[in-house]
């Protein structure tokens, strides 16, 4: 489970804080009272099991969690199969973005096409879900990146880390580039995508 996962991750670093305690509170907080990390820390002191870390440790742990993201996702997927049957025959993929109240670009926070039509720098998030609507894997990319380019790398990660090879990928028209369609028209993979009737050839319209 998560305690064992955090213990194994901690062996590769020299930090002194309890990663499992922090990650547990972040998960509780996201479910019970989704808010900032500061608010999550303040709210966690109201829980029966008191946190054994300081606010600064939450912020420091975020870099570790980001570096270990792929490992965490793969481990959680494998562990989840012991509890429920994961329906991975059909995978749904979509992208969204998040804005930041900052005045200039910084790292992955870049000016791009905001889903909320805001002028702020954004980061892009891509997410795969299984047939039950349970998250499978996600990726974070710069806000100025074409979201079509995010599908293939994350899908390759799923095939490698999750050992999946046979599935149908469902996307909207915005993610259905020719390159993505060709990639998912190979081996035991296939795809379903939305298609504008107006853009179809006349013979297909008929």
Residue ranges and their predicted role:
Residues 1-107, 119, 128-139, 144:
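Dynamic "connector" segments at or just before major functional cores
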Residues 13-15, 74-75, 109-112, 151-152, ...:
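Short secondary-structure boundary micro-motifs
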Residues 27, 77-82, 111-115, 123-126, ...:
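Generic recognition of flexible, low-complexity loop/linker segments
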Residues 107-110, 184-186:
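Short, solvent-exposed amphipathic alpha-helical segments in soluble enzyme
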Residues 110, 124, 131, 141, ...:
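Short glycine/serine/threonine-biased micro-segments
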Residues 118-131, 144-159:
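Structured alpha-helical segments in the cores of large, soluble enzyme domains
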Residues 147-206:
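An internal, acidic/charged active-site-proximal segment
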């Amino acid at each position: 489970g998560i305690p064992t996962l955090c213990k194994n991750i901690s062996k590769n670093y020299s930090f002194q804080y309890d990663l499992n305690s922090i990650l547990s509170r972040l998960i509780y907080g996201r479910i019970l009272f989704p808010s900032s990390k500061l608010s999550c820390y303040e709210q966690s002191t109201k829980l029966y099991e008191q946190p054994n870390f300081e606010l600064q440790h939450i912020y420091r742990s975020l870099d570790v969690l980001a570096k270990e993201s792929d490992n965490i996702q793969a481990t959680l997927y494998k562990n989840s199969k012991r509890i429920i049957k994961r329906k991975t025959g059909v995978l749904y993929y979509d992208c969204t973005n998040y804005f930041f109240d900052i005045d200039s670009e910084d790292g992955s926070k870049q000016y791009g096409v905001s889903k909320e039509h805001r002028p702020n720098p954004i980061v892009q998030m891509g997410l795969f879900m299984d047939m039950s609507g349970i998250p499978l894997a996600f990726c974070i990319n710069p806000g100025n990146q074409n979201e079509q380019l995010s599908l293939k790398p994350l899908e390759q990660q799923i095939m490698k880390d999750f050992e999946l090879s046979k599935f149908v990928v469902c996307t909207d028209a915005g993610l259905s580039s020719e390159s993505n369609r060709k990639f998912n028209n190979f081996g035991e993979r296939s795809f379903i995508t939305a298609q504008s009737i107006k853009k179809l050839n006349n013979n297909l319209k008929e």
